[in-house]
């Protein structure tokens, strides 16, 4: 089958809470200065590579939307259609949202910390609706009702992301459009797991860096015809190592 479908995945740039080493999840924080620079560089990489996004899919969280806007502006594609969906939101980190990662690691130990952070099917404790970090009263999720998560594991993220991939994103790919998905570490890990057929155990080792475009060439069944490639491999390696080290002082 022909490699006629180009898919670009872009994790949002470094956020204020990434900078402070806090669990973020669905808390709506903005990009740091570093994150803005990463997003602009991502757009420059797209332009330099000749990849021209025809449509953008992103989440309802500001850091992803900001990243997309800066990247598209740098690539002179700010005018393309945009589809936003909660299904591309970051994994909901439950009661961990707002906590310092290093302090959480010290309090609960490395085994529990990694279980909450990287296990496929073990979610953190749920977030109470009266927490200052709750989304229970957030108007952007008013239509979710019982679907509004209070915590998630990666398995849950896949369950809410895949229907959107299958109903919306693949439709654009089938139409011959180059698709840019600007989202989050775990929603993109969920999609990469699906695309690359990564096992439930091995997905724990996958770390996606902030602000570096990852390019897939897909066949007509939306299977990769070759391994996905970062447009800046060196920056991606440094960024992935930084993600892996989160929790350390």
Curated annotation (Swiss-Prot):
SUPFAM superfamilies: Phosphoglycerate mutase-like
Reaction equations catalysed: (2R)-2-phosphoglycerate = (2R)-3-phosphoglycerate
InterPro entries for the chain: His_Pase_superF_clade-1, His_PPase_superfam, Phosphogly_mut1
Keyword Chaperone included in the entry's annotation: no
Site annotation Transition state stabilizer: residues: 184
Sites where the protein binds substrate: 11-18, 24-25, 63, 90-93, 101, 117-118, 185-186
Tagged with keyword Isomerase: yes
Sorted UniProt keywords: Gluconeogenesis, Glycolysis, Isomerase
Domain of life: Bacteria
Function per UniProt: Catalyzes the interconversion of 2-phosphoglycerate and 3-phosphoglycerate.
Family label: Belongs to the phosphoglycerate mutase family. BPG-dependent PGAM subfamily.
Name the record gives this protein: 2,3-bisphosphoglycerate-dependent phosphoglycerate mutase
